[in-house]
Amino acid sequence: MKQHPLAQYLEAVPDFPKEGILFQDISPLLRDHFVATIDAMSLLFSAKEWAEVDYLVGVESRGFIFASALALKHDKGFVKVRKPGKLPNVHASMEYGLEYGTDKLEMQKGNGKKVIICDDLIATGGSMQAAAKLCNEVGYEVVGMACLVDLKALNSFSHDGMTVRSVIQFDD
């Protein structure tokens, strides 16, 4: 598979945050190619799909970057999925597995609107899966999921028949 041109700007960092993990650092993309990155993520969905979406949901913390920028670009609202203790009036929470441990996410009550969930990178799919389940639990309808980088070798995640759309994929 031909890789997206933005892939060349990722920086692979071995043994971060723990030994045995090859971390894909998106910092160079954010610093030097942010507009191109948001444009590429925007193209993951058609104009018709964007027209039907009400909110972009960002998964803490790097998902906030992409969801808020896409929300601004497409004149949509922004909703946060946060780690414990960061939101008032939490309606639901969920624990999930990471490539290197476990964590927990929380959300406020939703309102039945349609959402696209955004994150920076999907490894095992744990945080995206938790965010999708939380969105449904609090009252949102998940109509799409997007990330910048998908480490496909570590996951086969889908939610209600939807797979995560990504700009950059690594199969090994």
UniProtKB/Swiss-Prot annotation:
Role noted for this protein: Catalyzes a salvage reaction resulting in the formation of AMP, that is energically less costly than de novo synthesis.
The protein's assembly and partners: Homodimer.
InterPro entries associated with the record: Ade_phspho_trans, PRibTrfase_dom, PRTase-like, UPRTase/APRTase
HAMAP family reported for this sequence: Aden_phosphoribosyltr
An example Gene Ontology biological process: adenine salvage
Pathway listed: Purine metabolism; AMP biosynthesis via salvage pathway; AMP from adenine: step 1/1
Organism: Hydrogenovibrio crunogenus (strain DSM 25203 / XCL-2)
GO CC terms in record: cytoplasm
Taxon lineage: Bacteria, Pseudomonadati, Pseudomonadota, Gammaproteobacteria, Thiotrichales
EC number from the UniProt entry: 2.4.2.7
Gene Ontology MF annotations: adenine binding; adenine phosphoribosyltransferase activity; AMP binding
Annotated protein name in UniProt: Adenine phosphoribosyltransferase
One family name in Pfam for this protein: Pribosyltran
Organism domain of life: Bacteria
Main subcellular location of this protein, as a coarse class: cytoplasm
Family classification: Belongs to the purine/pyrimidine phosphoribosyltransferase family.
